[in-house]
Amino acid sequence: MAAGRAQVPSSEQAWLEDAQVFIQKTLCPAVKEPNVQLTPLVIDCVKTVWLSQGRNQGSTLPLSYSFVSVQDLKTHQRLPCCSHLSWSSSAYQAWAQEAGPNGNPLPREQLLLLGTLTDLSADLEQECRNGSLYVRDNTGVLSCELIDLDLSWLGHLFLFPRWSYLPPARWNSSGEGHLELWDAPVPVFPLTISPGPVTPIPVLYPESASCLLRLRNKLRGVQRNLAGSLVRLSALVKSKQKAYFILSLGRSHPAVTHVSIIVQVPAQLVWHRALRPGTAYVLTELRVSKIRGQRQHVWMTSQSSRLLLLKPECVQELELELEGPLLEADPKPLPMPSNSEDKKDPESLVRYSRLLSYSGAVTGVLNEPAGLYELDGQLGLCLAYQQFRGLRRVMRPGVCLQLQDVHLLQSVGGGTRRPVLAPCLRGAVLLQSFSRQKPGAHSSRQAYGASLYEQLVWERQLGLPLYLWATKALEELACKLCPHVLRHHQFLQHSSPGSPSLGLQLLAPTLDLLAPPGSPVRNAHNEILEEPHHCPLQKYTRLQTPSSFPTLATLKEEGQRKAWASFDPKALLPLPEASYLPSCQLNRRLAWSWLCLLPSAFCPAQVLLGVLVASSHKGCLQLRDQSGSLPCLLLAKHSQPLSDPRLIGCLVRAERFQLIVERDVRSSFPSWKELSMPGFIQKQQARVYVQFFLADALILPVPRPCLHSATPSTPQTDPTGPEGPHLGQSRLFLLCHKEALMKRNFCVPPGASPEVPKPALSFYVLGSWLGGTQRKEGTGWGLPEPQGNDDNDQKVHLIFFGSSVRWFEFLHPGQVYRLIAPGPATPMLFEKDGSSCISRRPLELAGCASCLTVQDNWTLELESSQDIQDVLDANKSLPESSLTDLLSDNFTDSLVSFSAEILSRTLCEPLVASLWMKLGNTGAMRRCVKLTVALETAECEFPPHLDVYIEDPHLPPSLGLLPGARVHFSQLEKRVSRSHNVYCCFRSSTYVQVLSFPPETTISIPLPHIYLAELLQGGQSPFQATASCHIVSVFSLQLFWVCAYCTSICRQGKCTRLGSTCPTQTAISQAIIRLLVEDGTAEAVVTCRNHHVAAALGLCPREWASLLDFVQVPGRVVLQFAGPGAQLESSARVDEPMTMFLWTLCTSPSVLRPIVLSFELERKPSKIVPLEPPRLQRFQCGELPFLTHVNPRLRLSCLSIRESEYSSSLGILASSC
């Protein structure tokens, strides 16, 4: 080639020498001598393409381009690239701009690629062909995609002028890249054009071919040629036995009659890439065959069959002499794609999809492993119902597709709002052009899980709506758990009998409910051939999203949002009660409230999911995921606490739970009138946690390799493996009592830092050793070492602080635990006192032999072997104090234990205040929590109520202390108030165990209706009840106005306190009336307050408001009815109209009338002063005096007053309202 030129530039000479070396090494057959003719042919081919655009640039050779082999691409090309031999830089820039404003175009590399186009991946047998295309040279094979394939190109050497190469993703180290061939390849050797047939090919057209199938018995062994237009092309189906596809030929497009042909010869599978709907073809040497397991017969290709373009001059229709009835038989027409809207069965919720063809561009990748994409920015595309593994690698924004016989589903639900196109096996997805954009940087969750998603479709047989929800749910789960808890490939791995997929296990409860296992397996032949068409996409039901898996941070934020959205001071303090509260009480009542949210409160319902961890900083259990952690309170079941530490590190899934939001508010509302003004709220914060029963949850162990490979933030607390430490020693102990978790001071050991230590979160445990120390032997524990003394009950005081605080929630009295110390055996490890944190005197008083500090690396296991069952049975019950000990003045043992239901929880002032609280100092009001509880006791029908106070350092209270919850209190301190009421306080020895959560639905139980005499029966009477009685007389009536800030009397709306510095001059009314009532069995003095006074006086709201307005002038009116007449304790005169009105009203039948009274005892059941005995009282009956024993009058507080059914009319005063 060089002989034809006098001089060759050195650069061209060097380029030609490199080209010759490359060609001889890469393209020439290795078994032959170097082919000297191949080099000039390749150079001429390159020059022809280089000069095809009329660009010379001073050289006839592309000197800036270099040859690249398949191996070089696979080894050295790490980034996606493209190469366009005939393009200038400006042409490439124009091409790249078409990638779109947000697209990232493929970078250009100046590379020359040559190779043989083949459908064989290697030098293998013909049967190994699966329809894929490859580019091959001497260095290797690389898979490729081509838009329009000419079957005559196979096996020939080509120059590829325009192509792009996409290397395997970084996460897929074992994968291979692929080529995208944009233009038709340029042959190095001229292609030989096969001459047409000498004689016309006898062919059958679809009508005759369909009729001929009826004569299958006469056509055995006979092969025919079929001709027609391609009207349908199925997907390429690959099963374990073989791969195949089915095409349908018709006379025209759209066709009235069609005939189906199965292509399953391996060498013919590549036809699938060459076929184009609407093009006419001839298929030669077809035979009639029956599909195994099917009734119908079909045409099928043979080994010698060929695919030819239909040329009318080269074919001749074969005339067949068939029987008349067969010719008259009307073959089944091909159903046409419907243009109507989705059909909807009016009698059900079943919808029918539309079947159509569509061409569009991919504008987004929604979930590549799941086969979900976006088309034209407005449609969804789901390829999961086809086997699209080969197509997945080219699918990215910018790819143009032609969809044949694709299903359109609208309003599928399940969180999907856009219409979705989904091809089944009958449809075909054909490439029209490749994307100019680089593949996106896929995250790990977008790269793994293809086999799991296929399992959902092909094994679980999910319909499209449920499949779309499942893919979304798996994405949510991957975001929650990967990669810190699990690796993506482990979470989304294929599920098998020996290795279940964790992702599928989390979805199984929902999937089993909506799509029970056992659905019929898809039959590919029926799905493609059967008429009418049946496939999983044909019918569907709109799916109401069953649930979602929010991150714990999202769940927490949504709970807080709902809690504060529902926070309404007016609802928490409804009128008329709030209008009588002074500012301090008003703000204290608003200071704490709570909200319980069930999963059904969210739309869709939320599923709780996280890894259970034990916090060593707070001593509580937490659920943790990628977004953070959420405190949780778990019970194994009702009245059974969580006690198995092996649950740490497990994945917990719960559909039934309570999301608790405790609201703490610091406010300065002057009065009830300003409750609607949020500006008076100074600070608000919330404590959010969840509580649920372990029996309602799904517990899944997380594989240990996943945890060890996680980052340091992994919630791993157990340093040992699942079989425990290989070396170590342990000892069993029975837990007798657990003290409160609180900050305590510890002694500083000698030689420690001189700095004053800060209080550390800790707790103590009192227990008894069961046997001696045991050493690790294999996977079990050896025999206990003999003890020096014969006392089997060796008490021990265990101290937990630092990291060992994490065991707090698992330790409960009455259980036997194994304390494990890893590492080499150390003599007397569990006997010696390794710390000086506690003095010997308390240990001696408790009868403890030793004090032991639990080290950070020690672990605990719950022991439940048969050897200790007797010990567990003997210590199973919780300690309970008798009701007599609780409600008595006996202080022999001031520590009491009992179970109770919490009735209310409020904030109150501290029990002991060293200094007077400053007015308005709301911070001081927050230092004490009062729980009013109803004791659980079988000694009386109506459980007595008791107040339990929690003060620092036990604040904030532990989780779960909510109204409606059942709780066991152990070792509370019993006290007696100055008014002789028994109450209890938390001490450092107090242990609280939640027995059950508040009920999800509250049922209002009416108060019992009793006679007043029943209240004289002591403990057998209810604390609150209803009685029908009659008001006999009024003892006293007080009406006054006070300052809402300092509660001093207000006259004419002004505070009368000396030196008043009240920030607001808001006055509120107060009212108290004392009545004498009787029901024929006993008498009672009833105290009514505020708005209940209006009901007692029989006044309507308007009259009551007018009366209070009149009282505002003097500020205070007190009427005493102990003697005759009324005494006015105010500046007003006795003969004033208001005084006369009140005196007349209180002695009129409008007040002295029958009523239905709801009340509670003024004397609390916890009061220990004995009841007043009956007294002698003189009665005068005419002239005769009588002496008789009379029971003391009951003292009641009014809860409500209703008019009796037998009450007479209230007269003019009431009727005027």
UniProtKB/Swiss-Prot annotation:
Its main location: nucleus. Pfam families: CTC1. GO terms for cellular component: chromosome, telomeric region; CST complex; cytosol; nucleoplasm; nucleus. Residues 328-347 are annotated as: Disordered. One of its GO terms (biological process) is DNA damage response. GO terms for molecular function: G-rich strand telomeric DNA binding; single-stranded DNA binding; telomeric DNA binding. Keywords: Chromosome, Disease variant, DNA-binding, Nucleus, Telomere. It is found in: Nucleus; Chromosome, Telomere. The keyword Nucleus applies. InterPro entries: CTC1, CTC1-like. It is linked to Cerebroretinal microangiopathy with calcifications and cysts 1: An autosomal recessive pleiomorphic disorder characterized primarily by intracranial calcifications, leukodystrophy, and brain cysts, resulting in spasticity, ataxia, dystonia, seizures, and cognitive decline. Patients also have retinal telangiectasia and exudates (Coats disease) as well as extraneurologic manifestations, including osteopenia with poor bone healing and a high risk of gastrointestinal bleeding and portal hypertension caused by vasculature ectasias in the stomach, small intestine, and liver. Component of the CST complex, composed of TEN1/C17orf106, CTC1/C17orf68 and STN1; in the complex interacts directly with STN1. Interacts with ACD and POT1. Component of the CST complex proposed to act as a specialized replication factor promoting DNA replication under conditions of replication stress or natural replication barriers such as the telomere duplex. The CST complex binds single-stranded DNA with high affinity in a sequence-independent manner, while isolated subunits bind DNA with low affinity by themselves. Initially the CST complex has been proposed to protect telomeres from DNA degradation. However, the CST complex has been shown to be involved in several aspects of telomere replication. Belongs to the CTC1 family. This is CST complex subunit CTC1. It comes from Homo sapiens (Human). The gene is CTC1.
